[in-house]
Amino acid sequence: MSLHGKRKEIYKYEAPWTVYAMNWSVRPDKRFRLALGSFVEEYNNKVQLVGLDEESSEFICRNTFDHPYPTTKLMWIPDTKGVYPDLLATSGDYLRVWRVGETETRLECLLNNNKNSDFCAPLTSFDWNEVDPYLLGTSSIDTTCTIWGLETGQVLGRVNLVSGHVKTQLIAHDKEVYDIAFSRAGGGRDMFASVGADGSVRMFDLRHLEHSTIIYEDPQHHPLLRLCWNKQDPNYLATMAMDGMEVVILDVRVPCTPVARLNNHRACVNGIAWAPHSSCHICTAADDHQALIWDIQQMPRAIEDPILAYTAEGEINNVQWASTQPDWIAICYNNCLEILRV
């Protein structure tokens, strides 16, 4: 019997540790598969791959593997047709690309831009380009963003199939960079934005890296932690400040002036996810245990209230909207993952 036959609205999985990073698989043959990263304040951390058994309506842990330090982000290859190898990337001390098999997950490549030093500048985040899945971009506390190119080689025994090289590295901000995201504008391959501790949102073009555009600066110069592009209208993006209770919506055509502020949360916001299928819906999640869905189509008129609210049993660390199944949102809090039908 299918999920839709049962019409269950919420599925829950309890991990053996606090869940921080989390993301949906996008492969069409792995509908309810997610990756979860542990948050343990020591070297030894874990990543789990879990899947929903649609017969039993229970999440099953398919695979667990070790990861040095907590993952700051994890992402599956944006492969909606299932034509590329089944790859998962994680950021932490370095960017790692893993190959997921039926029984084991193995490290394909470790991308390290600092070959001459024992010191590594931790990566705060990364993004995987949807148009060109051979491109990834990382953000780091060393003020830089690095764009990586992956190569997939031929099978030669047990030689890793995937390797990578630095396409470009740029000093993106005056202080630490906390997030990076590719834009779908201009073909979707060359434009990306970053946010950081200097409180600015900056836009870059891989074809013209000699200059960047400041789209927004926080009035109090509070660090900006996250940015998220609208999936359907590349003019819009959302960002939030460290310890901030509101999410700011920006229009790149009107720099430095927010077109909306979403401020119903009662504690600091931790996550933002735009709807994959609609330009006017966005989900925000916060320490107030709430996940809120907003309809922003009346911008620039003020948006007073969300259209949907869900209260979890703990502070929500992360929210992800399933790109291939737009009626499902995943949240994590404490040691729990929940997927919610919206």
Curated annotation (Swiss-Prot):
Major localization class: cytoplasm
InterPro entries for the chain: DCAF7-like, WD40/YVTN_repeat-like_dom_sf, WD40_repeat_CS, WD40_repeat_dom_sf, WD40_rpt
Sorted UniProt keywords: Cytoplasm, Developmental protein, Nucleus, Repeat, Ubl conjugation pathway, WD repeat
WD repeats (start-end): 6-52, 60-100, 108-150, 165-206, 213-252, 257-296, 303-342
Family: Belongs to the WD repeat DCAF7 family.
Cited function: Involved in craniofacial development. Acts upstream of the EDN1 pathway and is required for formation of the upper jaw equivalent, the palatoquadrate. The activity required for EDN1 pathway function differs between the first and second arches. Associates with DIAPH1 and controls GLI1 transcriptional activity. Could be involved in normal and disease skin development. May function as a substrate receptor for CUL4-DDB1 E3 ubiquitin-protein ligase complex.
Protein name according to UniProt: DDB1- and CUL4-associated factor 7
Species: Homo sapiens (Human)
Species classification: Eukaryota, Metazoa, Chordata, Craniata, Vertebrata
